[in-house]
UniProtKB/Swiss-Prot annotation:
SMART domains listed in its UniProt record: LysM
Keyword set, alphabetical order: Cell wall, Repeat, Secreted, Signal
GO cellular component: extracellular region; outer membrane
Ranges where the LysM domain occurs: 26-69, 78-121
Induction conditions: Positively regulated by WalR. Expressed primarily during exponential growth, with levels decreasing rapidly at the beginning of the stationary phase.
Main localization of the protein described in the UniProt heading: secreted
Gene3D superfamilies according to UniProt: LysM domain (3.10.350.10), RlpA-like domain (2.40.40.10)
Listed transmembrane segments: none
Subcellular location: Secreted, Cell wall
PROSITE patterns assigned: LYSM (PS51782)
The protein, known as: Cell wall-binding protein YocH
Length: 287
């Protein structure tokens, strides 16, 4: 009887959204210490969308101001904005279609997708969680859950199945050891994106800046942090990256002059920044 009622709710939800967009919006008040990126992650929305909804031209926000958060998932055109953690399998299941259909509709040659991009889904999402639960129960062949928007790799699955075989480098928790492990194994990792950029360097107090990154990292308190400033339209904020000559870092900051294929690497001192100068380097986006 319970399953019958749950199915009826799912069907009713589908019928109300079959010919229109299913959307809702809410308004939040910016709190002291909030960042635009942090708000986007907390509410599960894309940073670029958040700026468009509120007509923002920069990442600067002020405590006390109001921001509109829209949870719109699809439009009448059947477009869906990919979120961090999405996979083609998840999206196909969410919209009642197949991975193959999504690839055909969007001219995809692989399962690789990127957060912030849009996909044609040719339908609407169900409004009832019970419908999703039933679909998962009836579709055991669905692809396994992934933690990031990236192509599934057999080698990674093998590591997950054999946790006792972790290398010493993977078990170390110190920043220096992790950096060495990344440098020695980067060539064996499959990056989700690789590009050539112009790289300059900056310190925590260049040009009178506060020393706090766009994602809330206090560089004055973390002088050895591996952080780079990026154009979020090229490298998403929060991404783990490997920068040639710098090592593994987090794309945690932005800058007015950082546009397109250009990055700024954070270094502890002015002398380090001067020694770095201007370089052309390769950047691998690891997730």
């Amino acid at each position: 009887m319970k399953k019958t009622i749950m199915s009826f709710v799912a069907v009713a939800a589908l019928s109300t959204t079959a010919f229109g967009a299913h959307a809702s919006a809410k308004e939040i008040t910016v709190q002291k210490g909030d960042t635009l990126w942090g708000i986007s992650q907390k509410n599960g929305v894309n940073l670029k969308d958040l700026k468009e909804w509120n007509k923002l031209t920069s990442d600067k926000i002020i405590a006390g101001e109001k921001l509109t958060i829209s949870s719109e998932e699809t439009t009448t055109t059947g477009q869906y904005t990919i979120k961090a953690g999405d996979t083609l399998s998840k999206i196909a299941q969410k919209f009642g279609t197949t991975v193959n259909n999504l690839k055909v509709w969007n001219n995809l040659s692989s399962d690789m997708i990127y957060a912030g991009s849009t996909l044609s889904v040719k339908g609407q999402a169900t409004a009832a969680n019970t419908a999703t639960e039933n679909a998962q129960t009836n579709a055991p062949q669905a692809a396994p859950k992934q933690e990031a928007v990236q192509k599934e790799q057999p080698k990674q699955e093998a590591v997950q199945q054999q946790p006792k075989q972790e290398t010493k480098a993977e078990a170390e928790t110190s920043v220096n050891t992790e950096e060495k492990a990344v440098q020695s194994n980067t060539n064996n990792q499959e990056a989700s994106k690789e590009l050539t950029v112009t790289a300059t360097a900056y310190t925590a107090n260049d040009g009178g800046i506060s020393g706090v990154t766009a994602t809330g990292i206090d560089l004055n308190k973390n002088p050895n942090a591996k952080v780079i400033a990026v154009d979020p339209n090229v490298i998403p904020l929060g991404s783990k990256v490997y920068v040639e000559g710098y090592g593994e870092a987090t794309a945690a900051d932005t800058g007015g002059a950082i546009k397109g294929n250009k990055i700024d690497v954070f270094v502890p001192s002015k002398s380090d920044a001067s020694n770095w100068g201007v370089k052309t380097v390769s950047v691998k986006v690891l997730n």
